[in-house]
A protein has these predicted regions:
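Amphipathic alpha-helical interface elements that mediate macromolecular binding in regulatory proteins
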Residues: 1, 16-19, 37, 41, ...
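Metal/cofactor- and membrane transport-associated sequence elements
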Residues: 1-98
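Mixed-charge, polar/low-complexity N-terminal
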Residues: 5-6, 11-12, 52, 88, ...
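A generic structural signal for short, solvent-exposed coil/turn residues
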Residues: 13, 49-51, 91, 105, ...
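Divalent metal-binding acidic/histidine catalytic loops
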Residues: 26, 31, 35, 57-61, ...
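Polymerase palm active-site segment centered on the conserved acidic dipeptide of motif C
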Residues: 50-53, 77-123, 133, 224
């Protein structure tokens, strides 16, 4: 690879020459892709299959065991149904790549993981408490629900304007929390609709979510070890519930046995003329 000479550091004798790159000070933009291709090639050659929906998920399904590896840039989380296979995988990876181990997973990308004999509990308790503290609501009264059932938000054209930066910062922080908190997915989706021109009424309402979190920071997802593998899906909608344009909002979730594995809350793109049409 060749690069141009840095400005003001050109060689006076060869100003038009280029330099051959020995090592990039802060890495190259191609590095992540090269690393991913290198790791993918290694895993596929050893019997792993890459996920279709998640291209960073690799699964090795043998007759006697199951080994799963989840890749996030240069961090790899893996586990197996047989402990010896996980240990063997770790040793093989160390031979091929320079890497370090942190033993049992307890914290990953702000996710706190508690592993017990009965199952695994995933939460974002530390992150939730930081949100409450960040926006100065740790001393405020807790809210029993994330959104009011008696008052519906609207554009509020005549309302008092508030800082869009502050409002968007709250929405962004809360959206990241939905990774382990499906109970606030709908309410955040509703409040996120008013980021373009937030009013005081919107800010008061979105702070209610934070006050709700302040009372429930330790909520999370429990994945039972003894649950069956039956997949079940549920969905519903609130027909024409948006005051501004009468569009409906769809909600859905999927359970693998007793364990919640996927959920969504999304405003529909068009107006439905009946409940049946919305569904």
């Amino acid at each position: 690879m060749f690069v141009e000479q840095p400005k003001r550091f050109e060689d006076p004798h060869f100003p038009d020459h280029v330099m051959r790159l020995k090592k990039a000070l802060y890495g190259l933009k191609q590095a992540p892709r090269v690393w991913y291709d290198r790791l993918t090639h290694y895993l596929l050659n050893r019997g792993f299959k890459r996920g279709y929906a998640d291209r960073t998920l690799f699964v090795k399904n043998d007759k006697t065991y199951l080994l799963i590896a989840q890749v996030y840039v240069d961090d790899i989380v893996f586990g197996a149904t047989i402990d010896d296979r996980a240990i063997e995988f770790s040793k093989e990876m160390k031979k091929e790549f320079e890497m370090s181990m942190v033993e049992e997973l307890t914290f990953f990308l702000v996710l706190q993981v508690k592993q017990k004999k009965e199952g695994i509990f995933v939460s974002q308790e530390k992150y939730a408490r930081n949100i409450v503290k960040k926006f100065g609501l740790n001393s405020k009264k807790h809210a029993s629900t994330p959104i009011s059932s008696s008052t519906k938000l609207n554009v509020d054209s005549s309302g008092v304007e508030v800082s869009p930066t502050l409002y968007r910062s709250i929405i962004g922080s809360l959206l990241y929390l939905t990774t382990s908190r499906p109970d606030i997915a709908f309410s955040i989706g509703v409040h996120a609709r008013y980021q373009a021109a937030p009013k005081e009424s919107h800010l008061i309402a979105v702070k209610r979510i934070i006050r709700y979190i302040n009372g429930t920071p330790d909520y999370g997802l429990w994945y039972s070890k003894d649950s069956n593998a039956c997949l079940a899906g549920y969905s519903n909608e609130d027909w024409a519930c948006s005051v501004d344009d009468r569009k409906s909002t769809s909600g859905g979730c999927f359970y693998l046995g007793n364990n919640l594995v996927s959920w969504m809350s999304k405003k529909q793109n068009s107006v439905s003329f009946s409940t049946a049409e919305a569904e």
